[in-house]
Amino acid sequence: MELEIVHLYHDLLNTYGDDGNVKILKMRAEKRGINVNVKKVSVGDSFKDADILFLGGGQDYEQTLAAEDMVKNRAELIKSYIEDGGVGLFICGGYQLMGGYFVDGAGKKVKGADVLPVHSEAGEGRFTGNIIVKNSLETLVGFENHFGRTYLDGGEALGEVLFGNGNNGKDKKEGVIYKNAIGTYMHGPLLSKNPALCDDLIRRAMIRKYGSCVLEPLSDNYDLLAKADMIKKLLKEDGAK
């Protein structure tokens, strides 16, 4: 059994170490005996398919470069992949890029890939800090750092914000889930702090490729204890305000 992870624009969109998510996916899959190949794809490169598609975050200029290449050369392929149940994880700038459009800090409206049912606009202040999100799978923790304000035009939110700002600081929603794709502002890296979410992505990819999947549990006891302690402290801090 094997999976191929395609890491899009790894050289342009990795300001916040989001490639750690690819490393975590690879590690947790390989611990179950699943061989993983990571293919890095940037401007001018090609790919035909993937089992998991990943895109991280970056600065406005690099994001615009990636957007121009994606809209011109890849948008239809990626859209077809997601509509067919392909698994994707898109973080921060990658989340914005996969939407219908985003407005950058200079007020320029940039066309997105129109893969996820969202749009984004630059805000007046930066949302920076820890974030806790209630999801049906697990309570997620991460770190947000974004000027963008994202609004859902369909799909469902990744979860409800319990601490932090999330998509736009107004509706208490964070991220989006559309079919087997997730868009989110959560760094961390996200999957290192939330192993159940990581395993869910692996499981979805395996089911799509092989028809079924049973993942043997891994020992995440220490990670989960640290996560629970963090959640407790942050919610206590929030309640004291």
Set out the residue ranges of the language-model regions.
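N-terminal beta1-alpha1 cap of cysteine-dependent amidohydrolase-like domains
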Residues: 1-80, 192-241
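Amide-donor transfer/coupling interface in amidating biosynthetic enzymes
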Residues: 122-241
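A residue-level signal for conserved active-site and pocket-lining positions in enzyme catalytic cores
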Residues: 5, 113, 145
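Cysteine-nucleophile active-site neighborhood
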Residues: 60-137
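A secondary-structure boundary/capping signal
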Residues: 9, 91-93, 116, 146, ...
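Structural motif
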Residues: 52-56, 89, 183-185
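A structural micro-motif
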Residues: 3, 36, 86, 111, ...
